[in-house]
Amino acid sequence: MSLQVRILTPEQVFLNVSADEIILPTNTGQMGVLTNHTPLITAIDIGPMLVRSESTWQSMALLGGLALVKDNQVIILVNEAELGSDINAEEAETTFLAAKEALANSKTRKDQIENNLAFKRARVRYQVATLVK
């Protein structure tokens, strides 16, 4: 038996696959989900998600949302999602370094909040672009 994993964004069904294991970025840290997991609802943070089907891992960036786990089904509603294989690693690194510098040079509280969000988004894109090849 496997997990049925669906990732939904406002624009589309981003992913609909069977998986043996997933690792979710929750607000309290990374959480692994295997078959027959106890039912739960959890907040999804900006972070990398990993999906294992047989012996193959697939990485993706999730940009905040909710996940529901019940009866070997995982439904994830997120603002945005992007496959690691679709991200240009060099471009992601450049964006990450620029976001890191912008965060360090934030002058106002508003700039700090906006730059922190941009930094988290850039960091996760860079992580998943280089995580699993």
UniProtKB/Swiss-Prot annotation:
It is found in: Plastid, Chloroplast thylakoid membrane. F-type ATPases have 2 components, CF(1) - the catalytic core - and CF(0) - the membrane proton channel. CF(1) has five subunits: alpha(3), beta(3), gamma(1), delta(1), epsilon(1). CF(0) has three main subunits: a, b and c. It is a peripheral membrane protein. It comes from Nephroselmis olivacea (Green alga). HAMAP family: ATP_synth_epsil_bac (MF_00530). Keywords: ATP synthesis, CF(1), Chloroplast, Hydrogen ion transport, Ion transport, Membrane, Plastid, Thylakoid, Transport. It comes from the Eukaryota. The lineage of its organism: Eukaryota, Viridiplantae, Chlorophyta, Nephroselmidophyceae, Nephroselmidales. The keyword Chloroplast applies. GO terms for molecular function: ATP binding; proton-transporting ATP synthase activity, rotational mechanism. This is ATP synthase epsilon chain, chloroplastic. Its main location: plastid. Belongs to the ATPase epsilon chain family. Produces ATP from ADP in the presence of a proton gradient across the membrane. It holds the Pfam family ATP-synt_DE.
